[in-house]
């Protein structure tokens, strides 16, 4: 009885292995070319926006601390690209709270973000 069970188990296992190993593999995409992936648009655009955001950190700090309503076009563009085209939670992972991220996104997406819309009141320490 144990011999029949063992034989059946080995036979089924062998048939499964042969079935899986003989299937046709899908063609591999050209994902090994790192230059093509980096210049493909999306990833590079996210890195550029992150670099631009790094250069406008002072503007963002003043925006929240002093209630200044001036964020440059490049800074707003970086916030917009990061929150819409890249990983939306990236600003949160950089240390901004979810509320601050939403305020930045709302300010930069408003039609009059050129300097006439009010910002948050200054933080009192």
Swiss-Prot record:
Domain of life: Eukaryota
One GO BP annotation of this record: regulation of protein localization to cell surface
Compartments where located: Cytoplasmic vesicle; Secreted
Signal peptide, first to last residue: 1-24
Tissues in which the UniProt entry reports expression: Restricted to female reproductive tissues, specifically accumulating in storage vesicles of the unfertilized egg cell.
Keyword Signal: yes
Pfam families linked to this entry: Prolamin_like
GO cellular component, one term: extracellular region
Keywords annotated in UniProt: Cytoplasmic vesicle, Fertilization, Secreted, Signal
InterPro entries, A to Z: EC11-15 (IPR044711), Prolamin-like (IPR008502)
Biological role: Involved in the regulation of gamete interactions during the double fertilization and to prevent multiple-pollen tube attraction; mediates the redistribution of the gamete fusogen HAP2/GCS1 to the cell surface after secretion upon sperm arrival.
Similarity comment text for this entry: Belongs to the plant egg cell-secreted peptide family.
PANTHER family cross-referenced by the UniProt entry: EGG CELL-SECRETED PROTEIN 1.2-RELATED (PTHR35293:SF10), EGG CELL-SECRETED PROTEIN 1.5 (PTHR35293)
Protein name per its UniProtKB record: Egg cell-secreted protein 1.3
Naturally occurring in which organism (per UniProt): Arabidopsis thaliana (Mouse-ear cress)
